[in-house]
Every structure is written in C-alpha cells, then in structure tokens.
C-alpha cells in the first residue's frame, strides 16, 4: 500500500522528509563565508566581505557560468531558483574551459547550485547575471554555501531552527534580514543573535515563524574584534497554501 501524499501525525518531521505529507516540503539552507574581515557587515555566502547583490534580480534574466580551472571542463552544475512568477525552476549548465556558458532560463531568484556529474570542482565556479556574480561554488566544495533563501509563490515558509558558528577566536553579531512579500526594497531584521568561536549559536523556535510567499531571507554577520570563517544555517518548512 502506498501512503504517499497522506498526512501522518506520527513522526511528522520524518514523513515530511519522506515526501509523505501532502503540500509540505522541508528545506535546509546552509552557508559559510571563508574569511570575513574585522568590522565588516556581510551576507553569509561564498563571496567574503560582501552583501548579497539582490538588486541584480530586479528583473528576471539568464545566468552565465564560468570556471577558473580547466579540469572542471564538462562537469554539470544544477542551479535552483525561481522564475519571474516566483515559481520553482532549475537549469543544468555544462561547464566549458573554452569560455563562458550562457543559460536559457530566466531566473528571478537563485539560492542553490551544485555539481551533478564529474568529480568535485577543482577550481572556483562562478555564475553571473548582468555582469554581477550571484552564485559561487568554492573550489573543492561541489555546492554553493549560501544562507539566503526566497519563498516560492503559493507557499508559506515556517522557520523552525537556526544555527551559526565562528572560527576559534572570531566573534560577530548576526542578523536574519527578511524582505516580506518582496514589497519595495526594504529588508528588516527578523531575528538576531551573537556568535563566537567559544560556542555555537543554536536556536529552536518555540513556535515556527511564518514567512509569506515571495519573501527574501538573508543572514548577515557584523564582525567585531576578530575576523575568521563563519557559518550559518536554518531549517524552513514550506506549506502549499493552495491545498
């Protein structure tokens, strides 16, 4: 007997992950900044000391892929994001050592990229939109490390859990910025925390925090006395509001 798409009260979280809860999808977002300088504010993603360039997606458009090492020629990277109507989409790019590769799918948002063929990337892989770098896969990782996300159309995201860590000796103030419903250009703080190399920040929300469709999430850190490598991650449950 198949139980797919039926709601189970017992072990709800496990059954969401098993795709057995109708209209519910879990998403684990995780990011890292390789080395953030002292007294800087930056998004937690693969490009250190920079805020994520959301303005690059004021309009939807195609991505351009480029590699830094010829050994990555022929490998395939899958990009996940949203189209102009904020629906989930993806596109596969076959990397080339002879030049950049231009995609055919128009993205309104991107939030993950990863290799689906070949060995882990030898060199850095970059994706640009309109000349602005919007995705980076650091050498040897095979996957973007981005603590950012955008909630698709028709879904409400429920934030369950957030964590952050700092390299030994480093410390920072963290902010989860949210742009609700993508209204205007204003991000505001939805959650804040402190993190240091002596202890991981680990917070489970007593009640899952709702984030409406077409909202952007951007985890940022402001470093203080010491620089270093920082990580951040969060777990979000997407619920289809049309069911």
Cite the ranges covered by each PLM segment.
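Beta-strand-centric surfaces of beta-sandwich/beta-rich domains
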Residues: 2-109, 116-243
């Amino acid at each position: 007997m198949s139980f797919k798409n039926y709601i189970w009260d017992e072990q709800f979280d496990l059954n969401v992950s098993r795709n057995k809860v109708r209209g519910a999808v879990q998403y684990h977002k995780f990011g890292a900044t390789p080395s953030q300088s002292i007294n800087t504010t930056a998004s937690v993603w693969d490009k250190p000391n920079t805020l994520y360039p959301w303005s690059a997606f004021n309009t939807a458009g195609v991505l351009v892929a480029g590699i830094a090492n010829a050994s990555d020629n022929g490998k395939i990277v899958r990009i996940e994001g949203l189209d102009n109507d904020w629906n989930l989409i993806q596109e596969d790019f076959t990397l080339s050592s002879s030049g950049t590769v231009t995609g055919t799918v128009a993205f309104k948002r991107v939030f993950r990229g990863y290799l689906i063929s070949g060995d882990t990337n030898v060199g850095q892989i970059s994706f640009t939109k309109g000349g602005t770098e919007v995705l980076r896969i650091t050498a040897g990782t095979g996957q973007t490390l981005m603590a950012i996300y955008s909630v698709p159309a028709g879904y409400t995201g429920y934030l369950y859990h957030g964590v952050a860590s700092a390299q030994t000796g480093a410390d920072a103030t963290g902010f989860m910025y949210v742009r609700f419903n993508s209204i205007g250009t204003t991000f505001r703080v939805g959650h804040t925390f402190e993190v240091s190399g002596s202890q991981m920040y680990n917070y489970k929300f007593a009640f899952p925090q709702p984030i409406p469709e077409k909202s952007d999430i951007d985890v940022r850190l402001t470093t203080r006395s010491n620089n270093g490598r920082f990580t951040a991650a969060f777990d979000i449950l997407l619920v289809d509001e049309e069911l």
